[in-house]
C-alpha cells in the first residue's frame, strides 16, 4: 500500500485533494471514513471504483456495488463514475437504468458496464441484494442506513473470496454501529483502516480553495474563515455542528473508562514508589544531587527492578513534569496471554532535569527484555525523550507529541485492556483518580484540564498518560534489549568499590 503524507498542500492542477488521495491509495480490504459533510470523499471513491472496474481480472479488476441511503445518492454516484470514466479515458458504456427485483418490487437502479466485463452498479440497501455478488462494496452514509448491521453482514461475507468493503459516513450518534466499528478498530478489536476527515482537515488540504477554483472565485484566508464560520453558525446546536463537521458523534462526553472497570484492574502487590525533592535539593551541588539520586536508585529502585520477571518482555512509559505536576515512569510487563501488568510505577516530584534523566537511564538499563519506551515529548519532556533516543535509538524509543491524533489512536487500545480484563495496575486511590481525568472531549478521549490533589500537591492524570505511553511502547517492534545485572553484592569486592564504579562509569 502506498503511504502518502498526512498533509498534502493544495495543488490546483491535481484532480484529487490530499485526503482523497490517501483514501484511494489505501488498498485495505476493510476501510472506513468518518467525515465532515460535503468533503467530496464519495467523489474520490467513484474515481477509485472506475479504475477497479475498468481493469481486467488478471490486473485486479472486479465489479463494484454502491449502496446509498436513497435513489438520488445512487444517481449522483453513478454520474460521478461516468465523469471519471471519461476523464480517465476508460472504455465504458452509457449509464443504463435497470429494473431490480427487491422483495417483489421492481426497483429502478443504475449501472455502467466497462469493456473489461465488469460493472459499477447501484443497489438498494436490502442486504439480500448482495447475495451471489462478488466485488467491491461501498456503503455510503453508512450511519444512516436502517439495516446497516444486516447490510454489513452480507457485505463481509463477500470478503471470503477477496472482496473489499468501504464504509463512508458522517456520524449519527455515539451509539450508532458506524461509530462502534470505528471505536473497535481503534482499540484493535476490528481491522478496519480508519480515515478521519474533519472540516478543518479538508480545508487544510484545499477544500475551500477547490470550491473557489470551481466557482471561479478568488480564494483568501479571510473568505475561507468566514465560510467556515457561516457553516457552523447555521447549524441548530453546537453538538450538531461538531457531529456534522468535526466527526464528533452526539452524546460523547464524560468519563472515558468507568471507575468500576479501573477498580477491577487494581491489583495488590503492584509497586508504587516516589522520589520527591524538597527545596533544599536545589541547594546541593550537581555532584551531591547525583550521589543522592544514585543512592535512591540502588537502595529503593533496584530491588524492585530485580524482582521483575526476567522471562517477560517489558515496556516503559513516561509522562513528564518538572514542578507543577508529577513525572511518572511506568514499567509494563507483557504477559504470554497479551495482558499488560504495571508491575512498577515511580512518581517523581519537583526533580531537576538531570536527575530525572539519571533515574530514567538507570531504569531502562535494568529492565529485563526491554522492547520499547514511549515518552511524552511535549514541551520540556523532549529533554528526556532525546536522552533516551541518543542511548537506544528511534527503533526502541518514541518521542510522542501529545495531540488529538495520538489520543484518538492509542486511548481506545488502552481502554480495550480494561474492557477485556487484560490489565493490572497498582491498587492505589491516587492512580485510580488519575484515570478519571481521561474525558471524552469533542469526541476525543484525552486528559482534561482539571487537577486533583494528592498528599503533597496536585495531579493531572499523570499516571494515566504514563500507562498509555507504556502500552504504546509495548507494541514497538524495534528489537529487544536485555539488562546486564550489577555485580552480586556477595562478591569479593566491597560495596563501596561497586558504588564508585557505578558512579564513575555512568553517562550523566
Swiss-Prot record:
Pfam families for this protein: Terminase_6N
Signal peptide stretch: none
Similarity comment: family membership: To phage Mu protein gp28.
Protein name: Mu-like prophage FluMu protein gp28
Organism of origin: Haemophilus influenzae (strain ATCC 51907 / DSM 11121 / KW20 / Rd)
